[in-house]
A protein has these predicted regions:
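Active-site metal-binding loops of divalent metal-dependent hydrolases
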Residues: 57-58, 95, 152, 213
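N-terminal beta1-alpha1 cap of cysteine-dependent amidohydrolase-like domains
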Residues: 1-92, 100-106, 112-118, 125, ...
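Pocket-forming structural segment of enzyme catalytic cores
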Residues: 104-193
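Active-site-proximal beta-strand elements of phosphoester/diester hydrolases
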Residues: 10-11, 146-150, 207-210
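A glycine-centered loop/beta-turn motif at secondary-structure junctions
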Residues: 196-220
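Structured helix-beta-strand junction loops
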Residues: 85-86, 168-170, 202
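Beta-strand-turn-beta hairpins that frame and shape the catalytic cleft
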Residues: 8, 142-144, 201-206
Length: 248
């Protein structure tokens, strides 16, 4: 996919203990031909990005709770302002945990139900892709995608009222499922409520998911389903006048 507008520019936040930032940057630069900047968590300037990425890892060693310290990093004020203005933000794994701790997404991520760290390829069913055209516009409801997971605290939980609200608003966008797209207990790797693997905020511009799309963006490493999220972003940005008019 080639943009006629300037290349997308993404900022990847870096916290002490995260490590997926370089995977995201590699995909952005080498696979997609985008610009990617790694910005340390103490900074307050996101450097005029088109999108912001919160990567996976163990920010601050996951002390207290996953993401509990990272949410207070200076960069998060800038991320919150960017998201409030409608800017697209994605948080994968630890990034999802940080988004939840910061209040940008509801609910929390807890220890896996079986108390084991899970690192494997996982099948997921796409739900309500229209709720997030920026991140899921290239995916179709009901289809099954395959992304890797790598977490010990990925069990999504929320109170019943919040879960019902998310469901009713179409904000549950990914569920753990088997290869046939059936959401079952056996297909759920961590015990997440209602098999939830990914959700979006009310505007749909902030996506949190436990799987790692950046690790499924090259055929050589096992699959390219993750690349479709970035293609969705690229197409969405291409349609925005502010991006088309930007001069690098």
């Amino acid at each position: 996919m080639t943009l006629t507008a300037p290349r997308p520019r993404v900022t990847v936040a870096v916290f002490p203990g995260t490590w997926s930032e370089r995977d995201f940057a590699h995909v952005a630069r080498a696979v997609l031909g985008w610009e990617a900047r790694l910005v340390w968590h103490t900074e307050t300037d996101l450097v005029a990005p088109d999108a912001v990425i919160l990567p996976g890892g163990f920010a601050h060693g996951d002390h207290l709770r996953t993401g509990a310290i990272a949410r207070f990093s200076p960069i998060m004020s800038a991320v919150e302002a960017f998201a409030s203005a409608g800017g697209p933000v994605i948080g994968s794994c630890n990034g999802f945990q940080i988004l939840a701790e910061a209040g940008l997404l509801p609910g929390a991520l807890m220890r896996n139900e079986h108390l084991e760290f899970r690192c494997d390829w996982q099948t997921l069913r796409v739900e309500s892709s229209s709720s997030s055209p920026a991140w899921l516009g290239e995916l179709k409801d009901g289809e099954v995608v395959r992304l890797p997971i790598s977490h010990g605290e990925g069990r999504y939980v929320a109170d019943p009222a919040t879960l019902d609200e998310l469901e009713a608003a179409g904000r549950v966008v990914l569920r753990y499922a088997d290869a046939d797209g059936q959401v079952t207990d056996d297909a759920n790797p961590n015990g997440s409520d209602r098999g939830i693997a990914g959700i979006v905020n009310e505007r749909g511009n902030v996506l949190g998911l436990m799987p790692h799309p950046e690790r499924a963006s090259e055929a050589e490493v096992g699959g390219t389903d993750g690349l479709r999220l970035f293609h969705s972003l690229e197409r969405w940005l291409q349609a925005r006048p502010a991006v088309a008019e930007r001069r690098l």
